Amino acid sequence: MKGQYLMTKKIILIVLALVVALGIGCRSSIVKNVHDAPMTFATENKPSIEQIKKAIIVAGSGLGWRIKSQSPGHLIGTLNLREHTAIVDIKYTTENFSITYNSSTNLSYDGTNIHSNYNGWIQNLEKAIIVQISHI
């Protein structure tokens, strides 16, 4: 009787450990990068690379990103939320743009996976850039 009780207790502990492990795993996702997202514009005239740059900066700033110029066609975006920091490379031409992971703090990045909130931030940034560029 006592042996059966101990066995049941062990099984319950194993099941609880698996549930906790699965719950922790659900909080991370594969890093989302945006590759060569096409741009559409309000007019037939193609905007200049400087207009594109300004539109990306406005889009990111509206979401709390600090966007700094790295080189022509290359911006660095930094988002600080509470104790979390995400840094991305934003590369752009007059045809398309890309957002790629650069580095992070307190987002549990392991080389492939990252805290699931990160992907939401990137998706929001991508949408904001698309909207801002569509008004040029």
Q: What is the predicted role of each segment?
A:
Residues 2-3, 20, 46:
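Helix-centric, low-specificity signal for extended rod-like, repetitive segments
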Residues 3-13:
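Bacterial N-terminal signal peptides that target proteins for export
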